[in-house]
Each structure stands twice: as structure tokens, then as C-alpha cells.
């Protein structure tokens, strides 16, 4: 026997891990590159392109364009080595003398070769051979799945992953074939995009199946050394045992023994009744969490109504302090009561949904605030009642986050309005009655089945280094704010990434569903990741980069950065909430909601009006908030100090958290998976259902006529604190507006409910929509909607040295085949004459430099014939739509290069505080005499609707000023 001269020992799991990472990277890095560099090319197929098709197939991604094709082939080449090593290790592990193992290994080599065939022979190179290799690869998967599952060593985790992966793979094949037929033979628009999703799913399920080898290889160790092997296998085993080392599977096979002492996961079998009850309880918690997030996200929206209409501090802002109710748990009696019967507070929370029935805005606010008070007490108690060593807390966190995602899906289904918010009722889409019924049932189920859950076995110890209660509160408060700000609505990240036309990034429909599905996946994998200190550190760094790209960039880069950041926040939530259970709920949860409120105020102050006290401190400084978020998230990262078989009892700063046995976690995962699957299906349903057709027709296409309007809509809240989108839609439709601008329209903020008013208007009216500068631009919003295609649009932030930033949109429309520019702007307030003058000067420059016909729709804040209004018409060629209308102050319409044929001002009703101002124009070279004429001389098709004459309808009529009491017409 020779002596060893050198050696290298490492776990074989690393090989499986590298193989999984390389496999995933080989496909999804090229996908990201393709979406970023050749989006419109890769989504195009033989029948359709964008927007009918909006997601690329695997073949288009990996085979058609540089650099993604080269990157893919390079990464696949890197995958080859770990792939062959994995096959060799599995062959050694499973028994080299078994015929079935030999056949399976040979099949694995063949499968690898077939993969190389369709990788390096692309569909562009040779379509037939590419398909032959691809079909052969897919067919070989069936026996591969069966044989590997049968021949692999017993391991419950690996078996579970293989079962999931193979089942999903097989189930995906059938819809894949169906949608391919719909595309190839029936030529249905959008079918190939659906097919592409199933095709990419096959890749994921394939990688998932092979990733199970990571758990198979846990007892397998690489021991590379220069000496010869031991000649006597039994002596080798004896030496290993004398050293106290365990035999690996391969070593046990070599000496003819079996590893009998490997721990097997306990398999606790539950009856069908227990499974049903457990699922009902889980579902009730998800629904009650949905109510929690729905009510919490509505409070800021209700509070915002009062300073909005008072144009200053109203006093009702103090209602946000109801969120500090967890501080009351410092009272022992209340804490004990909330701990024993949390269902009472949950029930009061559900009853708060009925606040919508109260017509008085003040009463509605107070009831909602009380509901928030109860729900904060209830959920704080629910989390605090569970020991951090009890894995039931993981399930509780999962239901808490699924409830958040359910509220996001509810908003997604109603075009960014939550159907159970108090700003909705039976007339504008509210669904509170069904929500109340389900909520009461959920409370009953919760009351019946609510018991403390216990963990069956402690497999190993995981050490968390204690942090201070202050750090825990900062961390948790930051989590609550991030969950609310970035995840309560699936389109938040899209408005951050929006940069106008042509479209360079995601759209609410269908990509909002992508955001939801990614979030669901993050919640599902979080229990397996948040306990890893390495992941938390690396994830934190990636999340910081993600938030940076989300804020700095636009389009897909910003969106992907946001997805990385929000996914980390969801996973981080498990650690933050679990650690908070170590401390007094009054200290940590009360402190957390205080931090949350401070964040919320800062979130408002970044767009503070000039007259808001302290506005300059944070105005236009969202970057400061993101830095504070990163700083406070980092408070938790040092808590991870690594793993140990036995906790260090001498170190009093170390807290032991016992991990669950696999049976408990498996059952929890199954419930989470089922819930996530149902939520994902709903999101995909609404994404497909509300996909815009991008094929719209103006109201008078044969007349070459268009009607334009401008309306300041007060953030979509009417005089009675109800959502006004539907009423705005009806007025715009009845006025037959083809192009209109909306001002005070950026509602993608915490105090405005993260709504997107353009979604429902564009959908119901059949229009293209430009949201305007997003929430990252620190304005109060300007939006453009058009029946005509928006060829190009540019967003401007007008000079504002003293007050809030003023937004503007400069868009080019294809109006009956002619390019016509439209400018929509919202200038500063009366308090700052300097701002208004500089803003008007910049707008004049934009219009002067445009060579095309142009219509200006804006908020100027000026007397007629005085500065800054005259700055916009001086040296720009722009004409005031009606100079004789002296009763104007805010809204103005200017035009040039088109023929003015009509002008009307429509009463606002109770929608807002400003009328709808409109103009009718003809696209013609003959600009007419530019004189006013009687209505009788105007063709019927050129007239304004008679619907609003006299007393009008729905509170709208043609009399809203001292001058223009009916539509005026011109030649």
C-alpha cells in the first residue's frame, strides 16, 4: 500500500449544482439578451409579429441572432463537462453492475448528444434536422424520467422533485401541441406566444428534474489523491471508521456494504379529512391576508382625499397613526386577549370592508382606519404567538405574502383598482358584498381550526446571530414598505420602466402577469433559501444592483432590475418576520409600522407641492429612499453566521432555530404550490382577457376629423371620494374625443393606491395610452390617450427651480396618414411665477422646433393674453383656440397646421374641480377663413353631440363659464 502525497476532497453536490446553474444560465441568459437586443425580431414568426406575438420561442431565442446564439452555444459547451460528470457520478452511485443502471446511463449519454444536435444545428441552419434532434430529445425524456426515478438511491427530497418535474413536463406536452396546432395550421394571432411559454416551461421542468441529483449526491464525496487505492477494501473501511468518518455510497458499494444509518425523512401520513381541513385553514389565512392588504392599501388613498381637496393639511392625515396599534400590545391584558382570540380582530377587519356603504367621506375614513387598527393588532399577534423555533411561522408568512399577491391580482383584474376598496361601490365596480360573505366564512374556518402548529422533528440547528430590537424593527418596517410599494400592484415596475413610444419595455397586459408569477415563485422557494447566509448576502448585493437599474434605466433593463429586487424582498420577508418573533411585538411590530409610516411620508414628500411644509427636503430625491431601504435591509444580513451541527451554548448571542422534518415542510409546500398555481392561473387569465388589440378606429374616420380635449382629473377621486374612472370614460366617450390629455394622473404612489387610470380608459374607449413620466420622475402626472397610433412620444421634465417638477409629453400621432404632434403639459402652481415662466419658455422651444402641425393641451395657470400664456404663442406659430374666451385660468388649447372647426367646454359635474375643455379639428391643407359661424351652417358630422345641450346628462352640460355657453363653430 502506498502513502498519499496530496489530496483534494469536496462534495459531489457541487458538480450537480454547477450543472443546474449552467443549464439554467444557458437558456435564460440568451433569453434576456434576446429580449433586450432583438425583441421585435425574436417575437416575430412566419405569420405574425408584435404586438400579436410578444414572447419568443426557444428556437428563435437561441438560433437566430447574435450575440444570443453565440452566448447560448458557449454556455451549453460549458454545461457539457458537468453534464457528463453527473452521469458518471449517478452511474457510480446507483450501482455499476445493474443492467438497468447501465441502460439508463447510456440513454443519458444519447440524450446529451441529441441535445447537442438541436443546439448546434439551429432551425435557421436546417429546420428538418433541428426538429428531428428536438423530437428525439423529447421522446427520450419519457424513459429517462422513468428509469432515473426507478434506479436512483432512496431520497425523499430528490424523489419529490423528480415527481414534480416529470409530472409538469408530461402535462405541459399536451397544451404545447394544442397551441402549436393553433399557430401552425389555424394561424391564430398570439397562439405562438402561448406555445412559447409552454416551450420554455419544458426547459424549466427538465432542469428541475435533473436538479434532484443535488440531493442524491449528498453522501457522495470526491477524494482525489496521487496514491494508489487501498488493496484491501475491508481495511479501507476499517480505517475510515477508526477515523470517525462515514462511508459514502460509492465507498459502501466498493466494500460490499450498505449505508444503513442514513437518516430518512419521516413520512407522516394524514387522512383525507385532515388534508381538507388543513387546506381550508390555509386558504382562510390567505383570504384574511388578502383583506389585510386590501384595507391597508386603501387607507392612504382615503387620507389623500382630504389634503387634496383642502389644498393643504386637513388634520385627517392623523388617521395613519392607527397603523401604530401594535404598540398597544405592550399592555399585558390586551396582548393576552389578542393572543387568545385574534379572530375577533380579524372579524372586525373584515367588517371594515362595509365602509363603502357610508357616503360621508369622513365616516368612511374613520371606519377604514379602525379596520386597519384591528388588522395590525391581529396579524402582529398571529406572528408573535408562534415561537421562532416553530416552522408554522413559515406557513404563516407564506399565507401573509400570498394574500398580498391575491390583492395584486384583484387589482390586475379591475385595471389597478381593488374591487373591495371603499372608493368603489355598486355603481363603479365594487365587489364588497361577495368579499364580506367570503370573509365571514374565512373567519369561521379560522376560528374552528386555529391551533398552534408544532414541528415534528429537529433535523439540524441553524444559527442566527441576534440583532437588536431596533435593527429588527427597521428591517421589518422596510419590508412592509417595500411589499406595499413595489408588490401591491403588478404594474408598478412597468410605470417605473415606462419611457414612451415606441414601446421598449413591458406593458401592463400581459406582462403584469409575469410580475405576479415571478413573485409567486419567490414565495414558493423562499423557505428553502432564506436560511442560507450565503444566499442572503449574495441576494442582497444583487437586490441593490436591481434597485439601481430599476431607478436609473428604462425599458426591460429597469423591469428586470425591479423583478430581482422584489423577489429578494419577498424571500427576505421570511427572515425578517421570523426574527421579529424573538422580541416584544410592541417594540418590533410597533416600531416597524412607525418606520413604515416614515417611509410613506417620505414617499409623498418626493413630489411635494411647493406650498407643502418641508417640501424641498426630499423633493425629487427618491434615490435617498432607495438608499435607506438598502441600508435597513442590510441590518439583517449580519444575523447569519453559518450552520453548525450543535449550537454554541457558550455564545449567548446565538439563537437556535430548529429546521423542520421534511414531512411538515413538504405538506406546507404542497399547499403553497396549489395556492400559487391557482393565483398564477388567475393572473394569466386576466392577462389574456385584457390584452389590447392595438387596432382602434376614430369616431369620424370618413371626415378626417378629430376632437381633442384636456382635463385635470384630480387623481381619479371625485367630490365624494369615489373612483371616477368610469365617469371620466363615459364623458369622454359621449363627447367623442379622439385625442385627450389627462393632468394630475400619476396615481402610482402609496397615498394614491398605486392605480393606473390609463388602463381602464384605454381598454374601454379603445385607445393607445401614454402614461407619461412615471413615479420615478417625481411629477404629479400627465397622460395622453389617442384613437390614432402614437408613432413617437418623448417625456419632458420642465424647469422647476422652486416648486415640484412639471411633466410634459411631446407625441407624434399618425392622424389619417399625416403626422401631427400633440403636447400635453401641467405647468407649476400660482405660487411660483419663475417656474411657470421657465416652463412655458421650454414648451415654446419644443413647439417651435417641431416641423409638423401641432395641438397643445395644457395647464398653464395664466390670465388670457398675459404671460406665461403669451410665451407659448409668441414666435411658435401657435393659435389660441378662442382668444375671446377670457374666462380661463388653468387649461388652454393651442393649435397650428390644422383647421379649427369647433370649441366647447363641458361642465365637470362632481368628477373634479376643472371642466373638460375640447376642440374639433380637420386634417386639411385648407385652413379656412378662421371665422366663427352658426351651428346651422355646420355639417351634422362636424357638430358636438347634442346630448349635453340644455341640462345635459350625468351632471355634464355645455355651460361652465361666463363666455362660452354652448359649442362654438368656425370656418
UniProtKB/Swiss-Prot annotation:
Residues 243-971 are annotated as: PGAP2IP-like. This is Protein cwh43. Disulfide bonds: none annotated. It is a multi-pass membrane protein. InterPro entries: Endo/exonu/phosph_ase_sf, Frag1/DRAM/Sfk1, GPI-anchor_lipid_remodeler, PGAP2IP_TM_1nd, PGAP2IP_TM_2nd. Keywords: Cell membrane, Endoplasmic reticulum, GPI-anchor biosynthesis, Membrane, Transmembrane, Transmembrane helix. Its main location: membrane. In the N-terminal section; belongs to the PGAP2 family. In the C-terminal section; belongs to the PGAP2IP family. Residues 1-242 are annotated as: PGAP2-like. It comes from the Eukaryota. GO terms for cellular component: endoplasmic reticulum; nuclear envelope; perinuclear endoplasmic reticulum membrane; plasma membrane. One of its GO terms (biological process) is fungal-type cell wall organization. The chain crosses the membrane at residues 15-35, 71-91, 101-121, 129-149, 161-181, 188-208, 286-306, 313-333, 336-356, 366-386, 397-417, 432-452, 467-487, 509-529, 532-552, 555-575, 588-608, 622-642, 673-693. Pfam families: 6TM_1st_PGAP2IP (PF23022), 6TM_2nd_PGAP2IP (PF23021), Exo_endo_phos_PGAP2IP (PF23226), Frag1 (PF10277). The active site is at residue 826. Involved in the maintenance of cell wall integrity. Required for the replacement of the diacylglycerol moiety by ceramides during GPI-anchor maturation. It is found in: Cell membrane; Endoplasmic reticulum membrane.
Amino acid at each position: 500500500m502506498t502513502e498519499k502525497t496530496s489530496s483534494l476532497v469536496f462534495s459531489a453536490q457541487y458538480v450537480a449544482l454547477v450543472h443546474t446553474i449552467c443549464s439554467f444560465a444557458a437558456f435564460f441568459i440568451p433569453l434576456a439578451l434576446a429580449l433586450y437586443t432583438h425583441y421585435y425580431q425574436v417575437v416575430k414568426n412566419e405569420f405574425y409579429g408584435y404586438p400579436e406575438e410578444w414572447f419568443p420561442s426557444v428556437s428563435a431565442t437561441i438560433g437566430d441572432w447574435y450575440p444570443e446564439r453565440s452566448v447560448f452555444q458557449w454556455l451549453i459547451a460549458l454545461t457539457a463537462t458537468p453534464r457528463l460528470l453527473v452521469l458518471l457520478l449517478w452511474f457510480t452511485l446507483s450501482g455499476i453492475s445493474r443492467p438497468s443502471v447501465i441502460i439508463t446511463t447510456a440513454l443519458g449519454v444519447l440524450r446529451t448528444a441529441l441535445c447537442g444536435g438541436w443546439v448546434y444545428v439551429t432551425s435557421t441552419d436546417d429546420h428538418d434536422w433541428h426538429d428531428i434532434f428536438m423530437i428525439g430529445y423529447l421522446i427520450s425524456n419519457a424513459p429517462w424520467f422513468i428509469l432515473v426515478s426507478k434506479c436512483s438511491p432512496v431520497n425523499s427530497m430528490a424523489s419529490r422533485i423528480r415527481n414534480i418535474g416529470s409530472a409538469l413536463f408530461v402535462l405541459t406536452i399536451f397544451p404545447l401541441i394544442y397551441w402549436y396546432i393553433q399557430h401552425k395550421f389555424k394561424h391564430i394571432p398570439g397562439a405562438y406566444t402561448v406555445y412559447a411559454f409552454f416551450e420554455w416551461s419544458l426547459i424549466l421542468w427538465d432542469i428541475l428534474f435533473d436538479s434532484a441529483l443535488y440531493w442524491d449526491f449528498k453522501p457522495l464525496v470526491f477524494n482525489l489523491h496521487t496514491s494508489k487505492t487501498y488493496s484491501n477494501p475491508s481495511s479501507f473501511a476499517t480505517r475510515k471508521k477508526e477515523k470517525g468518518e462515514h462511508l459514502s455510497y460509492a465507498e459502501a458499494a466498493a466494500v460490499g456494504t450498505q449505508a444503513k444509518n442514513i437518516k430518512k425523512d419521516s413520512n407522516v401520513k394524514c387522512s383525507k379529512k385532515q388534508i381538507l381541513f388543513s387546506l381550508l385553514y390555509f386558504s382562510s389565512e390567505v383570504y384574511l391576508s388578502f383583506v389585510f392588504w386590501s384595507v391597508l392599501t386603501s387607507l392612504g388613498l382615503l387620507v389623500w382625499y382630504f389634503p387634496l381637496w383642502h389644498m393643504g393639511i386637513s388634520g385627517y392625515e392623523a388617521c395613519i397613526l392607527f397603523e401604530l396599534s401594535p404598540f398597544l400590545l405592550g399592555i399585558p391584558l390586551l396582548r393576552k386577549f389578542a393572543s387568545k382570540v385574534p379572530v375577533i380582530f380579524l372579524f372586525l377587519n373584515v367588517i371594515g370592508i362595509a365602509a363603502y356603504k357610508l357616503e360621508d367621506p369622513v365616516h368612511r375614513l374613520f371606519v377604514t382606519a379602525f379596520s386597519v387598527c384591528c388588522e395590525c393588532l391581529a396579524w402582529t399577534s398571529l406572528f408573535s404567538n408562534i415561537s421562532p423555533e416553530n416552522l408554522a411561522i413559515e406557513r404563516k408568512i407564506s399565507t401573509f405574502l400570498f394574500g398580498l399577491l391575491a390583492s395584486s391580482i384583484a387589482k390586475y383584474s379591475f385595471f389597478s383598482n381593488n374591487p373591495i376598496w371603499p372608493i368603489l361601490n355598486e355603481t363603479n365596480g365594487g365587489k364588497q358584498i361577495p368579499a364580506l360573505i367570503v370573509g365571514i366564512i374565512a373567519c369561521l374556518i379560522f376560528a374552528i381550526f386555529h391551533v398552534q402548529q408544532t414541528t415534528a422533528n429537529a433535523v439540524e440547528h441553524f444559527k442566527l446571530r441576534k440583532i437588536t430590537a431596533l435593527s429588527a424593527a427597521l428591517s421589518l418596517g422596510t419590508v412592509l414598505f417595500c411589499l406595499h410599494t413595489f408588490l401591491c400592484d403588478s404594474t408598478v415596475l412597468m410605470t417605473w420602466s415606462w419611457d414612451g413610444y415606441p414601446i421598449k419595455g413591458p406593458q401592463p397586459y400581459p406582462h403584469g402577469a409575469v410580475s405576479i408569477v415571478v413573485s409567486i415563485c419567490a414565495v414558493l422557494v423562499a423557505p428553502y433559501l432564506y436560511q442560507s447566509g450565503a444566499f442572503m448576502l449574495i441576494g442582497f448585493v444583487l437586490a441593490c444592483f436591481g434597485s439601481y437599474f430599476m431607478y436609473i434605466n428604462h425599458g426591460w433593463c429597469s423591469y428586470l432590475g425591479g423583478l430581482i429586487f422584489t423577489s429578494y424582498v419577498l424571500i427576505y420577508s421570511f427572515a425578517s418576520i421570523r426574527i421579529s418573533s424573538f422580541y416584544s411585538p410592541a417594540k418590533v411590530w410597533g416600531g416597524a409600522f412607525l418606520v413604515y409610516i416614515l417611509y410613506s411620508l417620505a414617499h409623498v414628500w418626493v413630489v411635494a407641492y411647493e406650498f407643502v411644509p418641508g417640501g424641498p427636503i426630499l423633493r425629487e430625491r427618491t434615490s435617498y429612499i432607495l438608499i435607506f431601504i438598502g441600508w435597513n435591509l442590510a441590518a439583517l444580513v449580519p444575523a447569519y453566521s453559518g450552520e453548525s451541527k450543535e449550537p454554541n451554548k457558550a455564545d449567548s448571542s446565538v439563537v437556535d432555530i430548529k429546521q423542520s422534518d421534511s414531512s411538515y415542510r413538504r405538506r406546507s409546500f404542497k399547499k403553497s404550490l396549489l395556492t400559487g398555481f391557482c393565483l398564477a392561473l388567475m393572473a394569466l387569465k386576466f392577462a389574456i382577457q385584457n390584452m389590447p388589440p392595438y387596432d382602434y378606429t376614430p369616431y369620424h374616420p370618413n371626415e378626417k376629423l378629430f376632437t381633442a380635449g384636456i382635463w385635470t382629473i384630480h387623481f381619479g377621486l371625485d367630490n365624494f371620494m369615489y373612483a371616477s374612472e368610469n365617469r371620466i370614460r363615459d364623458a369622454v366617450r359621449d363627447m367623442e374625443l379622439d385625442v385627450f390629455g389627462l393632468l394630475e394622473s400619476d396615481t402610482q404612489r402609496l397615498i394614491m393606491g398605486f392605480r393606473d387610470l390609463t388602463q381602464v380608459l384605454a381598454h374601454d374607449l379603445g385607445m393607445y395610452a401614454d402614461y407619461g413620466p412615471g413615479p420615478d420622475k417625481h411629477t404629479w402626472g400627465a397622460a395622453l390617450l389617442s384613437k390614432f397610433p402614437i408613432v413617437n412620444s418623448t417625456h419632458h421634465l420642465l424647469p422647476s427651480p422652486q416648486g415640484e417638477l412639471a411633466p410634459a409629453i411631446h407625441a407624434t400621432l399618425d392622424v389619417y396618414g399625416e403626422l401631427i404632434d400633440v403636447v400635453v403639459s401641467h405647468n407649476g402652481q400660482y405660487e411660483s411665477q419663475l417656474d411657470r415662466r421657465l416652463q412655458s419658455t421650454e414648451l415654446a422651444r419644443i413647439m417651435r422646433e417641431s416641423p409638423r402641425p401641432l395641438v397643445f393641451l395644457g395647464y398653464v395657470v395664466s390670465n388670457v393674453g398675459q404671460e406665461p400664456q403669451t410665451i407659448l404663442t409668441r414666435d411658435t406659430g401657435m393659435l389660441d383656440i378662442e382668444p375671446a374666451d377670457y374666462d380661463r385660468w388653468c387649461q388652454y388649447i393651442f393649435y397650428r397646421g390644422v383647421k379649427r372647426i369647433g370649441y366647447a367646454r363641458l361642465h365637470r359635474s362632481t368628477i373634479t374641480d376643472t371642466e373638460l375643455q375640447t376642440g374639433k379639428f380637420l386634417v386639411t391643407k385648407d385652413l379656412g377663413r378662421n371665422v366663427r359661424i352658426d351651428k346651422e351652417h355646420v355639417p351634422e358630422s362636424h357638430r358636438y353631440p347634442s346630448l349635453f345641450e340644455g341640462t345635459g346628462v350625468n351632471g355634464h352640460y355645455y355651460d361652465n363659464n361666463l363666455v362660452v355657453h354652448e359649442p362654438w363653430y368656425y370656418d
